[in-house]
Amino acid sequence: MELVQPFSGFLVYDLKQTPEDFQVEEILPSDLIQKTGKWMIFRLQKSGWNTLDALLRISKESKVSIFEIGYAGKKDRHASTSQYISCQKPLRVPKELTKVIQLDKIGFSKKSLSTELNVGNRFQLVLRNLLEKEIESIRNNFEKITKNGFINYYDSQRFSRFHSEFRLPILPFFKGDAETCLKLILTDPFPGEKKQARDRKKILYDLWGNWSQCEKWSKSKLEKNIFSNLKKEKKPTQKTYSDLILRFPEEELLMLVSSFQSLIWNEFVSEIFISDNFTGVWIKTKTGPLFFPGESSIQSVPFSKNLPVPGNPGIYKLEYSKKEIDTLKKILNQNGLTESVLDSSPFPIIKMNSFERKVRILPNDFQIGDFEEDDQHPGKRKVKISFRLPSGVYATMLIKRLMLRSRI
């Protein structure tokens, strides 16, 4: 990807200093919650916990399989969040967690909750550590977003498994190296993972190939099972590693696939803007540079514009123009892949279907408060902002546009 346009940094700010600085409220269809129904609907409020970990503790305490609990979306642990879950059986929170996880039954539904029922999210955020001299720039960017919106890129939360050399675990898998894929899944730490967990994964990384020792350092039943099987193999083949990857929960395999689709879509969109001679700036992200168009360029992208996220049934059967197909092939080639990887899912039990995604998003009810003294940073300012976004749109990407240093 040619980076002819300039790079831009960001204005000074801190986000998520406390969970209360990042408040998220899930929005469901107005007619979904009823007075009667097969499924009970609960409001789940949490702070400092991600959704899946909270559900695991709730399911264990309630003696209910986690697969019996429906939810419409996952929420970050570095936030104070309110969302909804469904179950046909009563649910409760462990007593020791009631200060950080609250669960209230609020009604019933005729169907279990799923991601298709997530209408969007309402956000209330606090930006801290702001410089007085940069307030004018923030206000200017606020006006630009209110008028022009922002580009609907996937943000870093989508890529929790990102490696500096291999990028995503699934990329080596596509290239026939299932062993490296498995190694990354088992040994590459997540951002924010505790030191003890990171140290254990480092030990597994160093011991890789010594399956008996790896088995001793295993923590979960799945890890023990994987290393036990490898110990029995005299010469594991790529098929051996591939079959072992299929033992991971469907949720984890789905994340491997969806993060790949998201990465390709991000780079696809940026490359299209550049090929259309858009003016603007690049920003640096964990997964690589992304292009933010300037005002005149972004206004040429209709709010109704959708660009399919690449996937099954393959790029030639999707509604791409010839130029878009050529651009997508270029992006895949830069990642060492051919277009055939998008014809079907690499895992038989997981779908990798294409779906429509809006390119440009206009936030609803976007408001900015007064700039006040920051109680956590003497001499600095803080400001409260609020807005609503459709499901699947990243609030942190809006913040990146709001805090962009370049005036575009």
UniProtKB/Swiss-Prot annotation:
Entry function: Responsible for synthesis of pseudouridine from uracil-13 in transfer RNAs.
Enzyme Commission code: 5.4.99.27
Name of the molecule in the record: tRNA pseudouridine synthase D
Catalytic center residues: D76 (nucleophile)
Broad enzyme group: isomerase
Family in the record: Belongs to the pseudouridine synthase TruD family.
HAMAP family recorded: TruD (MF_01082)
Species assigned in the record: Leptospira interrogans serogroup Icterohaemorrhagiae serovar Lai (strain 56601)
GO molecular function, one term: tRNA pseudouridine(13) synthase activity
Pfam family, one: TruD
Keywords: Isomerase, tRNA processing
Coiled coil residues, start to end: none
Reaction(s) catalysed (UniProt annotation): uridine(13) in tRNA = pseudouridine(13) in tRNA
InterPro entries: PsdUridine_synth_cat_dom_sf (IPR020103), PsdUridine_synth_TruD (IPR001656), PsdUridine_synth_TruD_CS (IPR020119), PsdUridine_synth_TruD_insert (IPR011760), TruD_catalytic (IPR042214)
Alphabetical list of CDD domains matching this protein: PSTD1 (cd02577)
GO biological process: pseudouridine synthesis; tRNA pseudouridine synthesis
The UniProt record lists the keyword Isomerase: yes
Key word tRNA processing present: yes
The TRUD domain, residue ranges: 149-362
Top-level taxon of origin: Bacteria
